C-alpha cells in the first residue's frame, strides 16, 4: 500500500455522501475503518467550509462599508448557537465554542480580504 493511503472497505467507499450517511463508527473493528471514516468526514467538512466561504464572498459583495464586516454581536450569536448545538449532541461546548471562534475569525478575515479585493 502507498504511504499515506489506507485500504477502504468497499462497502464504505470513498464517496462524498451526506454527513451521517451509512457511517457507524460503533461497527468499526479496525483503525483502517476509523481512518477512512475520518478522512471521509474531513472531505465533507472542507466542502461545507467552501460553501461557508462562498457566503462570506456574498457578504463582502453586499456590504457597502468595510466596518460592517466585523459584527461582534453576530459573532457572539454564531458561537453561542454552535455551543448549544454541540452540547445537545453531547459534545464539549467549550471546545466547539473555541473552534467556532477561530472559524468566525478566519471567515471575517476572508470577508475583509474579499471586500478589499472587490471594492478596490
Residue ranges of predicted features:
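Domain-level signature for soluble enzymes in the chorismate/prephenate branch of the shikimate pathway
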Residues: 2, 9-120
